[in-house]
């Protein structure tokens, strides 16, 4: 039996969170979502996902700063962070702070599924 993949999505867009949750649950994933990166290390530590999807624009701190925090934490730094944004110019910056990959918004379902398969 295949292990259930645990996926954490940080995005302030409610529609995107709902759509990703539906898609990933159909894939058999366990999902946690957050519209804020406040206390991100605590949020992630409590859920311990297999992969994190991180939006660039969050209401409290940027996805860049949130990714830096995660990658600086020895317990959490091995969790793949997939950065997503409508701003394609941020891809190199995201990767320079530790993001493992980048998805350009809007993305199709297969791109989301491929990231799960690639990193989990």
Model-derived regions, located:
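Two-component/phosphorelay signaling modules centered on CheY-like receiver
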Residues: 14-32
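Hydrophobic/aromatic residues positioned on beta-strands within the core alpha/beta folds
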Residues: 82-84
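Non-catalytic signal-transmission and effector/linker regions of two-component phosphorelay proteins
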Residues: 1-6, 110-120
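Alpha4 helix (beta4-alpha4-beta5 surface) of REC/receiver domains from two-component response regulators
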Residues: 65, 87-104, 111-114
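Acidic catalytic/metal-coordinating carboxylates
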Residues: 35-36, 62-68
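Acidic, metal-coordinating helix/loop segments flanking the phosphotransfer/catalytic sites
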Residues: 33-51
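Active-site residues of response regulator receiver
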Residues: 55
């Amino acid at each position: 039996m295949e292990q259930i993949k645990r996926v954490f999505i940080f995005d302030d867009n409610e529609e995107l969170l709902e759509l990703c949750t539906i898609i990933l649950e159909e894939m058999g994933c366990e999902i946690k979502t957050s519209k804020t990166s406040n206390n991100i290390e605590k949020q992630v530590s409590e859920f311990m996902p297999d992969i994190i999807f991180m939006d660039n624009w969050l209401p409290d701190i940027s996805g860049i700063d949130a990714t830096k925090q995660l990658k600086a934490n020895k317990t959490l730094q091995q969790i793949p962070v997939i950065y997503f944004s409508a701003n394609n110019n941020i891809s190199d910056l995201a990767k320079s702070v530790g993001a493992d990959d980048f998805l350009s918004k809007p993305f199709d379902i297969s791109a989301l599924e491929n990231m799960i398969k690639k990193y989990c």
